[in-house]
Amino acid sequence: MKQLIFLLICLLSLLQYRLWLGDNNLSEYVLLQTQIAGQEQSNGKLVARNQILKEEIIDLKRGTEAIEERARNELGMVKEGETFYRVVGSELRERNPFNR
């Protein structure tokens, strides 16, 4: 009976050693769980970004309004015969050193 108890204590000690100090121990498990959570969050952001880009591509393929909007906003283009007016807010006028 004493030998059985000694054997069980040795087995329990070995298992405890592997749990706390061995390869793939408990602290590594917790570290990996936090890394997985961070990666899942990053993946979620990338999936949302990809969805926005897909919708933009579909919009650009279907019609000319999206192309016209990009040309106006990003390239500053205007239609033929159209007059472009830029309205400068009061904040920009106050910051402009040449407006005195």
UniProtKB/Swiss-Prot annotation:
Signal peptide: none annotated. Residues 22-100 are periplasmic. It holds the Pfam family DivIC. It comes from the Bacteria. Its main location: membrane. The chain crosses the membrane at residues 4-21. Keywords: Cell cycle, Cell division, Cell inner membrane, Cell membrane, Coiled coil, Membrane, Transmembrane, Transmembrane helix. GO terms for biological process: FtsZ-dependent cytokinesis. It is a single-pass type II membrane protein. Belongs to the FtsB family. HAMAP family: FtsB. Essential cell division protein. May link together the upstream cell division proteins, which are predominantly cytoplasmic, with the downstream cell division proteins, which are predominantly periplasmic. Part of a complex composed of FtsB, FtsL and FtsQ. This is Cell division protein FtsB. It comes from Shewanella frigidimarina (strain NCIMB 400).
